[in-house]
Amino acid sequence: MATFQEFIQQNEDRDGVRFSWNVWPSSRLEATRMVVPVASLFTPLKERPDLPPIQYEPVLCSRATCRAVLNPLCQVDYRAKLWACNFCYQRNQFPPTYAGISEVNQPAELLPQFSTIEYVVQRGPQMPLNFLYVVDTCMEDDDLQALKESLQMSLSLLPPTALVGLITFGRMVQVHELGCEGISKSYVFRGTKDLNAKQLQEMLGLTKPAAAQAGRGPQQPQVPPSNRFLQPVQKIDMNLTDLLGELQRDPWPVTQGKRPLRSLGVALSIAVGLLECTFPNTGARIMAFIGGPATQGPGMVVGDELKTPIRSWHDIEKDNAKFMKKATKHYEALANRAAANGHIIDIYACALDQTGLLEMKCCTNYTGGYMVMADSFNTSLFKQTFQRVFTKDVQGCFKMALAGTLEIKTSREIKISGAIGPCVSLNAKGPCVSENEMGTGGTSQWKICGLDPNTTLGFYFEVVNQHNAPIPQGGRGAIQYVTQYQHSSGQRRIRVTTIARNWADAQSQIQSIAASFDQEAAAILMARLAVYKAETEEGPDVLRWLDRQLIRLCQKFGDYHKEDPNSFRFSETFSLYPQFMFHLRRSPFLQVFNNSPDESTYYRHQFMRQDLTQSLIMVQPILYAYSFNGPPEPVLLDSSSILPDRILLMDTFFQILIYHGETVSQWRKAGYQDMPEYENFRHLLQAPVDDAQELLHTRFPMPRYIDTEHGGSQARFLLSKVNPSQTHNNMYAWGQESGAPILTDDVSLQVFMDHLKKLAVSSAA
């Protein structure tokens, strides 16, 4: 019999799903007492090398309000060629193509190992990939040159049939016509005036796709509308390479003490409108490359006077950010338009100061786009990250998927409360939609314009079965995730994942529910809720909510005697959860101190889309120690791990940091590694560097690489993350110093746990 841990791991590997609880309380009342809701982290396109796509279409339940897909949980009558839907119990006839099925000749979708299965939709046209580059020209020459080279490189990575367009902007916005031989032709727009799709259509002389197709005979293949602004790579490769090479810095003079006039809001608006007119409801990718904040027109986030800095958290709290609300509204409207048409907006912001990611966050968060933040386009961080957008799978297809929709079906005892992740609601009301919303709720379908194999969403459920209506012994609740998307090869695909979990009576079987708790998934699902709240609520309120939930969980599942904190015990399945909450409270997702609004936005954006493993690293970074005492080993994220004769490697997801202890640092400065008799020291110095390189080469987006030492200014990144078990207040209390004291007033994990136990066992709490 597999342990729960093995069961959880197998389910994640097979179906890309992790639940907070793997046995579900059987009534609404008991479920609310569990504190952590029944919820799942789901990775729709989790890579499965053993999952070949099936070349036929799924069989659907015939009930109009259900339409669930045939799956291994359905009961089948092979003789009568009927199947019963496991969600609504409707009996359905198999289609004629299934005439040959029997107990020994089952279709793949009925086999238990295919609880996740992928279908290729045979009907409909295959659409090419569309890329629209939106390029800022208000930047230093070396930055612009590096960006131009990256864009030219990207053309060689695109399939020959992919369509590419180019919009450049500074004080004006230029839409480049790419079909012209031998001449550069572009339409110039004022950067201060917004245009709607209809105005843009008339100005650029675009025809609506429907009108262009109307005169076509029924036998002719569907061709994309002729379009001078988006052309196949194979046709314009040379022209576009030359055009990019000739791009100059924005010619408008910038006087001393002023920022360049940058019309980012209008440029993005034109990009969204252009795709809206030419490729509605088709996957497309707007890639915006930004070297500074928008300083004029709709969407401006700061004025052009350099003496007036861009808004800080302090300004926002004091309601002193005069452009913020208007700019956010502008970008939110663009994000909704793009999402409605299945178009992705990526933002690559490379500048030393803020660029306005806070105001633009909807553009990426609503459309499943990438947000990348670096100091300059001339850094390996940007260049490598941009190249990884075009990563291919073993078949040579891009790993990106476009224009996705995700629908959830549930058995009648459970309803869907909402989703948290890079999606927008499709407002599909139905019998399985809960009235209590968590995240993006009130629907059972969401649009996810951009997906990759790591894109992960959190789904929150509500048990609706009444307390006095017991579920039969051995009953199971089921959930089906149906993801439809445009594969990068142009095919439409449908991936279906169907899972079931046992019900248990929380009064008589509380032990089996407690044993099924997945503390890692629960911590990240609660963290997503907290970060979602932090976008609209005050920081201290969110921390109080998180603390209250943790205390209630300890009271419900801890073992203790009333009023005796020393008696408190947590079972193994819960023991790490308080530690995750401790680190989450200190994380940049909930603490904005020392981070700009743009940095906080960037951190939260990444957290809301990554899978469980990466999310855990973000909440509680991993620390490895290298020393002469043995092979590299994981050590506690604690100040006691910082020893003079150790090298530490810390992975926070956003940074990879190598820290040399005091003694090691002195040896390195003395040059021992260059002496032949100290070759083992040279190997010790090299080991963490090799391990760091491996992480740097595989992660998206590429992390920042920091090499520091005891007393170095960048050691602050490590010191701010470790649990301060030794501080300047208690460093002499133990009689001898072990580890490095941290100069902080933050409470340590031990103090946090003592306080938590005291509150959990108190009758008043």
Curated annotation (Swiss-Prot):
CDD domains: Sec23-like, Sec23_C
Positions annotated as Gelsolin-like repeat: 632-718
Gene3D superfamilies (alphabetical): beta-sandwich domain of Sec23/24, Sec23/Sec24 helical domain, Severin, von Willebrand factor, type A domain, Zn-finger domain of Sec23/24
Keyword Kinase assigned: no
UniProt-listed InterPro entries: ADF-H/Gelsolin-like_dom_sf, Gelsolin-like_dom, Gelsolin-like_dom_sf, Sec23, Sec23/24_helical_dom, Sec23/24_helical_dom_sf, Sec23/24_trunk_dom, Sec23_24_beta_S
An example Gene Ontology molecular-function term: zinc ion binding
Superkingdom in the source lineage: Eukaryota
Topology versus the membrane: Peripheral membrane protein
Binding of Zn(2+), residues: C61, C66, C85, C88
GO biological process: cartilage development; COPII-coated vesicle cargo loading; embryonic neurocranium morphogenesis; intracellular protein transport; pectoral fin morphogenesis; protein targeting
UniProt keywords, alphabetically: Cytoplasm, Cytoplasmic vesicle, Endoplasmic reticulum, ER-Golgi transport, Membrane, Metal-binding, Protein transport, Transport, Zinc
Gene Ontology cellular-component annotations: COPII vesicle coat; cytosol; endoplasmic reticulum exit site; endoplasmic reticulum membrane
Compartments it resides in: Cytoplasmic vesicle, COPII-coated vesicle membrane; Endoplasmic reticulum membrane; Cytoplasm, Cytosol
UniProt entry tagged with the keyword Glycoprotein: no
Any single Pfam family the record assigns to this protein: Gelsolin
Domains: entry comment: The Gelsolin-like repeat mediates interaction with proteins containing PPP motifs.
Family the entry assigns: Belongs to the SEC23/SEC24 family. SEC23 subfamily.
Subunit structure: COPII is composed of at least five proteins: the Sec23/24 complex, the Sec13/31 complex and Sar1.
Record's function text: Component of the coat protein complex II (COPII) which promotes the formation of transport vesicles from the endoplasmic reticulum (ER). The coat has two main functions, the physical deformation of the endoplasmic reticulum membrane into vesicles and the selection of cargo molecules for their transport to the Golgi complex.
PANTHER family to which the protein is assigned, alphabetical: PROTEIN TRANSPORT PROTEIN SEC23, PROTEIN TRANSPORT PROTEIN SEC23A
Protein name, as recorded: Protein transport protein Sec23A
